[in-house]
Amino acid sequence: MDTILITVDALRADHLSQYGYERETMPVLQDCFAEGTTQFENAFANGTHTGISLPSLLTSRYLGDNPAINGPTIASALPDGVTTIGLHSNTYFAARIGEPAGFDIFEDFDVGASRETEATRSSVHRLFRKTMDAIRPTVERFGLREKAETMQRTIFPARLIHESTAYETAERTTNRALELVDDVEGELFLWVHYMDPHRPFCMHLDEPEYTDERLSSGEIHDLMSEAGINPDQITAEERELLIDLYDSELRYTSREIRRLINGLRDRSRWKNSNVIFTADHGEEFGEHGYYYHRNRPYDELLHVPMFVKGPHTGESLSEQRALLDVAPTICDWHDVSQPGGFLGEPLFEGDSRRVIATGSFTDSLPVVAGRWGGWKYIKTGDVRELYDLTADPNECENMAAAEPDRAELFHEAIPERLMNEDHSGVPTDTSDEVSERLADLGYLE
């Protein structure tokens, strides 16, 4: 029996039609995760960014139990005879966490290494883009835009014209995953992490989807930087453009996930496999004053999609679940005991979870949130927030002063160690290439 774990970076649940969004941003979920699949309506991340949430997913522990990633993981818990493969290209995860334990094959696309071919391609590509951006007004004035774009596509494939160098594209991620699967005999555990919905957003000219206008790389970069540094200066029109770019990335990623699934089908590794699809965290678009994921544990960052194909699946499940529950579920599927230290439970067992999530502001103040019983509690330094999620699902009216006893109950239920942990952890001892990628991802603003 094979197990497939597909995760998407920065994918918020409410930007999927399956969770009520007006756009069908990920049709692969409807086509490949419909019959015999359970949709979890209330799945939540245990951290607000990758460096917290992915370790929690892989180890079923909180980042406050640092260094959790060096302990048992999903991969190390699985029995002998199961080939374990992991793929990701998240520079932040690689720089901060390194390689999780237990994977027979772990592919991070050599993140941060000196790669002459890739570096040369990227440098030439950036120079070409800058030149095209500089001469664009002249090109358009003389009606030469079509010829310029033809020349651009001749030099660089269309899919690369606005490609980020901060991570590998979904296309290359799928290609590499299928290459690695081809070398496996016997049972397989495959984890594939797609990065494309994470900033920096790109334009895929072969499938633009939701962007009506073609933007230069410089224009996109400037807008993303402004949203990160001066979010209060972003206009309503610019916000909608950022959302269009984000949704287009979801659609592009959907296409590549479909190709992964079709490839697994062709290799007879899909029909009878157990599958989990989820995200490491969501994304902000100014709901609480910030863009991207500034580590503030409101639901736009914590509420993630989750679809599961396997034993006992079907219909939907509304009780709260957490990413901590992924590893115990996979252990259960493979009939192995959970390692000591796993804090989650199998997804199809038990009552609604008490979700605890950690994060931090960019000034590194520890932030901890608790979400259960229809309420959300957030503690940032000495400041407390409390939200009635039934009456105030958008978390706008802080009830901590009006409900001090309830706030105190939340406070007492959250482990003290999580309230004192520095959860920012932006790596500083990195190569120039890694630092450049971290900057492109927005972590150094």
Regions found by a protein language model. Give the residues of each.
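Catalytic domains that recognize anionic headgroups
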Residues: 1-445
